[in-house]
């Protein structure tokens, strides 16, 4: 399995409703990406203070790399990604992606 972790540094002006709409768009991809197992999202709750300014995020679990790669190319993912970039501080520099085999 692949765990696809995405950490976000939203602009201060990004409203909670916009954040939720972004997460809803990611969750909706489960309906069109076979092998997309699970999505979790929310704010960082770590007390360590080592978040690098990334205060929100989501984690997607895929059956394998092939499914992950299909998700990355899917038009709905591309649209959600563009929405994320518009909502994050510094555009792409406000997004951190980390994938690992689990």
Residue ranges and their predicted role:
Residues 3-10, 43-72:
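Short, well-ordered beta-strand segments in beta-rich or mixed alpha/beta enzyme
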Residues 14-41, 76-85:
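Short amphipathic alpha-helical segments
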Residues 37-38, 66, 92-93:
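Secondary-structure boundary/capping signal
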Residues 37-40, 59, 96:
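Residues embedded in well-ordered beta-strands within globular domains across many folds
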Residues 42-52, 82-102:
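Glycine-rich beta-strand-turn "strand-cap" elements at beta-sheet edges
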Residues 75-76, 102:
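Short, solvent-exposed aromatic-acidic interface loops
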């Amino acid at each position: 399995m692949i765990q696809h972790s995405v950490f976000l540094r939203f602009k201060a002006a990004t409203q909670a409703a916009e954040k939720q709409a972004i997460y809803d768009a990611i969750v909706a991809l489960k309906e069109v990406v076979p092998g997309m197992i699970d999505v979790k999202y929310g704010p960082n709750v770590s007390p360590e203070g080592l978040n690098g300014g990334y205060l929100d995020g989501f984690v997607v679990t895929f059956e394998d790399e092939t499914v992950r790669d299909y998700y990355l190319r899917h038009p709905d993912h591309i649209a959600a990604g563009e929405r994320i970039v518009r909502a994050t501080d510094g555009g792409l520099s406000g997004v951190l992606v980390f994938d690992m085999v689990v």
